[in-house]
Amino acid sequence: LYVSTEPWSVSDPFYQRSYAYQANGRELFYNLIHLSAHRSVLPVAYQFVKSHLKLSKTHFYPPRRALDNADPLVVFAESPRPSFPDSVDFPACIEQVAPLLQTAPRWLDHISTVATGENEIAMGLFNISEHLNKSVLTAPVRHSVIASKDYSQHPDRVSPVFDLAAVQLALAQFPMTLLPEILGFTLAYCQQPSALDLLTAGLGDKWHQDLRDPLLIETAAIRSGQVSALQGLIKRYETDAQAAGYGATWPRMQQGYGLYGQLTERCVKAISERWGRPQTDEQLIEALFKKLASSAQGHHVQALLGGKKLDHWFAEQPFNSREFMAALTASSYVNLQAIERSPLLALFEFKGPMFGVLNNEDLRLLKRWLEAGGRQSAMRPHSIQTVVGSIVREPQEQCRQTINFETLSNRDLFYYLVNSECYPEVIDSATGRVTKVLRLARWLNKVPFNVYEHDRLDQFIATIYQRGITGYQAFKAPARVSKATYIWGIEQLAPTILADGCWLQGASQLQFSPYQAVGDLLQKIYSDEMGNGDVLKNHPCIYRRLLASLNIELPLVHTRDFSAHRGFLNSAFDIPVFLTALSLCGNRFLPELLGVNLAIELSGLGRQYMTLRDELKYWQIDSAIVDVHIAIDNVATGHTALAREAIALYLDQVQMIQGSEVMNQHWHRVYQGYSALNTAGARFKAALVLQYLKKRF
């Protein structure tokens, strides 16, 4: 059972770095979407989730019978049906909940990794996530827009929506630590109505049922269709946890369930209040000043307001908008007797020093506010502001001793990379290891062509494939290598094959990048490596069965005992460390990752694999792991084809945005990644040959 019973903790230096981040849903939403550049936000994300779990009310908790309920849609906390003004329609509902639609079910993105690749609970959740991701209802907002800072800070969108969206993204980072809560959260997502379900119920007759059928009904059916499988997983998890001595896990699952229900209700309530209770011009102008303050510093060196330099006003964190507004209305910049003659307004006129800073709508708002004397006034239709909520930062429950990852061997580093959820500080070391291998690969290998064209890539792949397959001959007994040698080699390959697919375990992070389509292709390959959640097709599980058939008993990959296994060569960890480290580096090495992926998929084809399959069968050794790679890695429609498509699509996008010269530079990086696989494995290959010559099985 892969679960942590200890509080999540990090080293003190890493925790101190987290104080650079604000602990509110809007900021966290943005930083988690850009996690590869903001790893230090993880302690904030963890505390954010834990704080909301503590605040979840028991009346949202499901009773025990929820695990046996035949009705797939259950509401345990009934809320009044909302009623909205006539101006509110279905697109308005979609716009408000877009962050929720784009982040569901993202909390399951990392449920199946190297650490959990053989865990049946994780595989079951991975399978469920595959179904939930087929939802037909998505927000008509580009991912690139949602990933922008302005989107999460826009006052037209209520903060509780970003709280829930941030929780959905944050849960994904703790699949081991918060597994019980994730199980409960997912069950609630599948059983309870979503925020959009509840909002559209408030539209009443304005939105006809025949429009609802192809949208919400089908999406709800996809969710409810996973309830039975989830109930089975939860029961299995409880049994396993009890057998392992972890105690009762149902209360934690209830908290996760209640978390979804409570935050969903908060979203609906906040949106309903927003639509039902218009805001004032004072609130709107306050939001405008807050927005302008961050970029105004440095432009008003001499100007004074209320006896204080303007730059000092703008430098304050947080910006004191209330005092600023009071000082402004009391200053000589505003003529309350004749607003049109106010020096403040002249600043924004054509040829004025601040012309263009405010648009026409902003100027009308400013005039309305000034005409009301700078006081609270009735609102006319305009954008709506909301106060950004925040959690109280708590002291870290436990800080570990700092680990110097730079001094660790690949064997020792492997454990921390596999368990990076619990050791996020390892990412810096991972980046360093990857950089060293890539640098050496660039020095040792010459790119086959400098100017990229699709036809040249196709020819390159065809040449490699033909070179690999040419010379294959039908097997004739006896085998060239002894059975004992094969058994020993199978054991040595365990760290690599039991981590199969690891290089793509972070591909889901591309969902919010300009390369979403590239990420979809990589995710398809990764899903296949994981058997799409099927234990019979899961590659690590196939290899584990092979090991068992040869009486090779190895600890689970995520344990210290695995990397400490004395039967492994030290260099057996070179390839999995490189690949796992690469997966943790986010989008920084995307072109290199695409090249590595192509090299791996092509390596599963050709006469070597075909001869290996023949000889394994001769020795009556299960060849399933070889068979499956020969089949799914094929050049025509398999993983090699997807790898080629991902490279071509990526380089097309680079060319479109940055031009041909930059595209060619990125092609060089792709090839550098392609070459790096051999570079990373060179020491291991040499050690295998040397040990074979020594042992002579």
Protein language model regions, located:
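Intrinsically disordered, low-complexity regions enriched in proline, serine, glycine
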Residues: 356-357, 624-626
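Aromatic- and Gly/Pro-enriched helix-to-coil junctions and flexible linker segments
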Residues: 275-405
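Histidine-centered, metal-coordinating catalytic motifs and their short helical/loop contexts
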Residues: 129-133, 212-231, 338-350, 625-645
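Acidic, carboxylate-rich catalytic segments that either coordinate divalent cations
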Residues: 222-283, 631-697
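Extreme N-terminal leader/anchor segments
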Residues: 1-60, 383-446
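Substrate-binding/catalytic groove segments of enzymes
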Residues: 193-197, 343, 351-357, 377, ...
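Compositionally biased, flexible interaction segments
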Residues: 33-80, 287-322, 328-329, 412, ...
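Active-site-proximal alpha-helical scaffolds that flank and shape metal-associated catalytic sites
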Residues: 55-221, 251-290, 448-625, 675-682, ...
